[in-house]
Amino acid sequence: MIPSEGLGKACPCVFANFPLGGLRGPSLSLHMATNSTTKNFIEGLTFDDVLLVPAHSEILPRDVEIKTKLTKDIILNIPMLSAAMDTVTEASLAIALAREGGLGILHKNMTIEKQADQVRRVKRSESGMIIDPITLTVDAAIGDALQLMRENKIGGIPIVDSSGKLAGILTNRDLRFEKDMHRKVSEVMTKDNLITAPEGTDLKGAERILHKTKIEKLPVVNSAGKLIGLITYRDILQVTSFPNAVKDSLGRLLVGAAVGVSQDLMDRVAALQNVGADVICLDSAHGHSKGIIEALKTIKKNFRNINIIAGNVATTDGAEALADAGADAVKVGIGPGSICTTRIVAGAGVPQLTAIMQANAALSKKGIPVIADGGIRYTGDMVKALAAGAGCVMMGSIFAGTEESPGDTIIYEGRKFKEYRGMGSLGAMSVGSSDRYFQDPEADVKKYVPEGIEGRVAYKGMLKEIVYQYVGGLRAGMGYCGAKNITQLQQANFVKITNAGMRESHAHDVEITREAPNYSRK
């Protein structure tokens, strides 16, 4: 058990009975030493150091509830976030993860305009009703229409007049044999016998109209004939195809976006809020710092109705500081990621399981969720992170190998890989993430002191297959602990294990001839 007094004492036994409160209290939290001649220590543990203790269970894995709070205002259907990294999360992955019930955090290594466009892409990917559909006026050229269709991957555009009234619909079929790119869209669009829906039409009513008329796009107009929305057959199909998707009040997928302490911070936050970002992630390698705390206060003062995730921290004091500054969720993790070298380069950090417990000890009574960022290698690690007090886990390398990630696909020795790099790597810092590590964005790349590396991860296929295995592992773990939901899982006990115990936990004394989709020793 972790000692209850005297931070330097050895751990006397192998059974650790520390659900949530085991690291609470002044003698067990990571506070700065007040006496410069005395150094206090606690034992720092990570996922491989412990196992969850099985308990009496009256629930089957398929019946557990895995919904969780991302912030006080946002509920996710699965406790999974994708990392705000430029080889992990852009619109395609954010869309795929939101459809499965999680949330993608778009990286910030791009211009404000491009990041806002990425948010817009997620929001437009599906919707109960598109309230701001892409439109063209009657005097636009066919070439403009084709470009818009290509850029937004859409097959039709409503055409409006100067007053906003619906004048017609332009689809791929109308343009199939057109060669004059300067011809006006009004000359080729469908304008007679337009089928529309009145304001207030719900999805069921829209589906009946679409089915009866055999069309794919249904403009919604008000009593004055002005276009106020668009309902598509594809959006209706998405509702049934992805029943676990997380959506906002308008039926659009949820998405987050990262920002840093930079000169364009407030402009970036404003742009992201304007296009509908559901949560902003104020991202730093060291969240317990003056710059982050002041930036957080400034954002909360100027944008009162916005959810902010702030981080990263690894101590009780750090978590409390961000909570007091207005964070709606706190992200935990200094150095646990597979591509992060902070602990080696800077000598600073806290093993991830202990860091999660530290943060949760500070925040649980405040009702502010903890996000465990980094260090997840197996599905069981996610279960342990949640049991230690996290509400969600954020993963980078796990998602970096998926089809939807933005990293380049490469072939090496006959196998497919995807590029993956830390945001503290030279490559990432040179294109925008240096402020995350408090380094001058204008400096020559040779002057950077990297805290991450660039590498590759095995190609893993579609994201939904990865999510399926992680959700399955979580359900299994909750079943073993007798937990009906994540709150009950956080009351589970841990047992501290030795290296021999971990070797015993892995497959051993056998040569694996057929790999499982959720297990590898590499």
Question: Which residue stretches match the model-derived regions?
Answer:
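Active-site-adjacent beta->alpha loops and helix N-cap segments on the catalytic face
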Residues: 112-119, 228, 232-245, 264-266, ...
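Alpha/beta catalytic cores of nucleotide-metabolism and tRNA/nucleoside-modifying enzymes
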Residues: 30-56, 136-137, 198, 205-208, ...
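Short beta->alpha transition motifs characteristic of CBS
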Residues: 106-111, 154, 158, 165-181, ...
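Bateman/CBS regulatory modules and CBS-like beta-alpha motifs in cytosolic regions of diverse proteins
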Residues: 60, 64-76, 83-85, 114-154, ...
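Catalytic cores of alpha/beta
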Residues: 93-94, 267-272, 314-332, 377-391
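Short beta-strand/loop segments at the ligand-binding rim of alpha/beta enzyme cores
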Residues: 75-80, 129-132, 249-257, 300-314, ...
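Glycine-rich phosphate-binding active-site loops on the catalytic face of alpha/beta enzymes
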Residues: 102-114, 280, 284-289, 332-346, ...
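Glycine-biased, low-complexity coil/linker segments
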Residues: 5, 21-22
